[in-house]
């Protein structure tokens, strides 16, 4: 019998309940007179009306954009960078695994570059690409690609040898073994790591938007800072959190739907 805490509805209800208690506590704390916390972090009843009063637009003059545009711009940047990193890491990982010498020479380089924080690439990206979408996409790519490439090589080593021997005994060529055995075996693990790295990629693109770009969700927060508008800052932070959570759920759905053969 399935335990109650393993049921999807119960898990959803607990999450919804925890957020409800948080919002209620947040709102009630604003009624405690001169509360220094709510002066810096105004409750939702104060910063949410900002969205409706501005007709869902953020910014000044020609720099203003609707909140939908800000969300879509940021999503395009982070998903483009992650897609390029995912495909590139699979290709490079497969190529390096074809030769032990290539692995010996190049994996140490990947291992040195992988721990570098994505935000550290911002100055270089601005010099190379200037202010634009390519800067954000490059930063996301650099923050994810090297980790995924190392993971691809590790996943290839974990492919059970009996799978490969069985395919070879059945007359499978090297190409068919790679196509039908090795690649399907490594895809679930690499995609799982891609999903886990989404948080780092999400933070990287937001940091890029805050430091050098003129649009996106990160710019919403910076606009609030420049205007000394804590309501706008909190609004941007909440939208960032909700959007990031939604994308993570979508990636989890893709993982369960399209990589169903994974045993993990």
Predicted regions and their residues:
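Transmembrane alpha-helical segments of polytopic membrane transport and secretion proteins
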Residues: 1-20, 249-264
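Short cytoplasmic-facing helical segments at TM-TM junctions of multi-pass membrane proteins
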Residues: 151-193, 217
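Hydrophobic alpha-helical transmembrane segments of polytopic membrane proteins
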Residues: 218-253
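Transmembrane alpha-helices
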Residues: 138, 142, 175-207, 235, ...
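Periplasmic/extracellular loop-to-transmembrane helix junction in inner-membrane transport proteins
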Residues: 32-83
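Transmembrane-helix boundary motif in ABC transporter permease subunits
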Residues: 80-110
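Alpha-helical membrane-interface segments at transmembrane helix boundaries
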Residues: 68-80, 103, 110-113, 130, ...
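Generic hydrophobic transmembrane alpha-helix motif, especially the helices
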Residues: 111-145, 154-155
